[in-house]
A protein has these predicted regions:
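Conserved beta-strand-loop-beta-strand hairpin that lines the nucleotide-binding pocket
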Residues: 1-6, 51-125
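Two-component transmitter module helix at the DHp-CA junction of histidine kinases
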Residues: 3, 17, 24-28, 56
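Conserved short strand/loop->alpha-helix "switch" segment adjacent to the catalytic nucleotide/phosphoryl-transfer site
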Residues: 21-45
Length: 125
């Protein structure tokens, strides 16, 4: 399998399951450490969930790219608004996504890319 995989999907909650399936297949084909799969799947789900909730446009593009033992998960959406971790109160039912990504990834970032941005996270694989 190539060292990268790309999928363009509807910007909808249902896309998360399809993209997790792509991640599982990619992990297996790239012979990644299966013990790292749950963390990578949660990071992917949070990135996709943020794009679904906060971005604009009908679609989003997800790219998985492996470099050695690092998997970059990148989500390109149509919103120019950059993500920012915030403190969620105990009662809040949302608002922890970027904190989860920060905890589970080696690093994460955001790059402007017209007409929106790419939010990415590097996880061990």
């Amino acid at each position: 399998m190539p060292s990268s995989s790309v999928a363009t999907v509807p910007r909808a909650p249902e896309s998360s399951a399809r993209l997790r399936s792509l991640l599982w297949t990619t992990f297996a084909c790239w012979d990644c450490d299966a013990e790292r799969l749950d963390d990578a799947a949660l990071v992917l789900s949070e990135l996709v969930g943020n794009a679904v909730r906060h971005a604009v446009g009908d679609t989003m593009q997800v790219r998985l790219r492996r470099d050695g033992h690092v998997l970059r998960i990148a989500v390109h959406d149509g919103s120019p608004v950059l993500p920012a971790p915030r403190e969620a109160s105990f009662e809040d039912e949302s608002g922890r996504g970027m904190l989860i990504i920060d905890m589970l990834s080696r690093r994460w970032g955001c790059d402007p890319l017209a007409p929106g941005k790419v939010v990415w996270a590097d996880v061990s694989c």
